[in-house]
Amino acid sequence: MEKMNYLLPEESGEMTLSGITTLRKMEQKLRNLFESQNYQEVMPPNFESVELYTGLDAGFEQEKMFQFINHEGKSIALRYDFTVPLARNFALSELKEARYSYFGKVFRKEKRHKGRRTESYQVGTELLGLSEVTGDQEILGLTFMTLEALTLKNTIVEIGSAAFFKRLCELSGGDAPLFSELLEKKSLSGMKAFVDKHEMRGAPRDLLLALMTTTDLPTMKKLVLATGDEKLSQALEMLEALNLPDKTAICQIHYDFAMVPAMGYYTGLMFQVYVEGVAQAVISGGRYDKLLKQFGKTTGSIGFCVHMENVMKGLNND
């Protein structure tokens, strides 16, 4: 008889008893906060049709999905994302506006030693039906309240724009994949080689070389203005309309003009929250208006997700 292997598979996530106690306390704090702000808790299914994810122009990677064939011969996936099923539910409803919150796991195949778990626990909110600036301000305000509830110290909120990023890709000389990779890696030497390769001169060259080092809006506005590109200017105007301070009582606020969308469906504001001592973001969010449009509903939509395992790491570092 073969000896049983009692080791957990690497895809699994396990937590200590003390960790579970802390997690449940954090959950309750966030539940109370979201309820106080009129965000209704919902519980999407654990299983979804693979087609729900692959049929959208959202940048999902099918090879990262846990898939199986059900008794009807249809391809089913473990929940890959919360936003898509909630966007679908809202689009199919008669509601003009909705505020949702959720608590649960998502499942994505990740490469080993990348600092990401295949099985990850998320808490999040979705705000659907509000105009861009109004919705962005509400979600950012709720993000700040979430940080306060989690009692995380030394946090930085990084602000970016998917519209800004996508326009930069259009201007990248037909080499958008490499350009995006350089931004994601924050490779200054790589960007220098990139602009040399494409023989960029003047204002466009200055802009690309400054993307990774410029963290304030006025400086970036001057660089963009010099290029004369209207779409880039419009993207920055949307960020400026948020009227964000440099810091709040609980966090610093920086602009990351080299930010690459974490999700393919982001269209406008996007943000990442980092805490000292944790490599991955503890909160990530963004605007996804075009995702709703694919479900036949034209309105504003934005949300954020709290990565609870990363929050736990941050609390342990305090």
UniProtKB/Swiss-Prot annotation:
- Any remaining note in the record? This function is generally fulfilled by the C-terminal part of HisG, which is missing in some bacteria such as this one.
Protein family according to the UniProt entry: Belongs to the class-II aminoacyl-tRNA synthetase family. HisZ subfamily.
Top-rank taxon of the source lineage equals Bacteria
Query: Gene encoding it?
Result: hisZ
Q: Which GO terms describe its cellular component?
A: cytoplasm
The record ties this protein, via Pfam families, to:
tRNA-synt_His
Its pathway is: Amino-acid biosynthesis; L-histidine biosynthesis; L-histidine from 5-phospho-alpha-D-ribose 1-diphosphate: step 1/9
Q: Which GO terms describe its molecular function?
A: catalytic activity, acting on a protein; histidine-tRNA ligase activity; transferase activity
**Where can this protein be found?**
Cytoplasm
Question: Which HAMAP family has this protein been placed in?
Answer: HisZ
* GO BP term (any one): histidyl-tRNA aminoacylation
Keywords on this record? Amino-acid biosynthesis, Cytoplasm, Histidine biosynthesis
- Protein name, please? ATP phosphoribosyltransferase regulatory subunit
Tell me how this protein assembles.
Heteromultimer composed of HisG and HisZ subunits.
The task this protein performs is described as: Required for the first step of histidine biosynthesis. May allow the feedback regulation of ATP phosphoribosyltransferase activity by histidine.
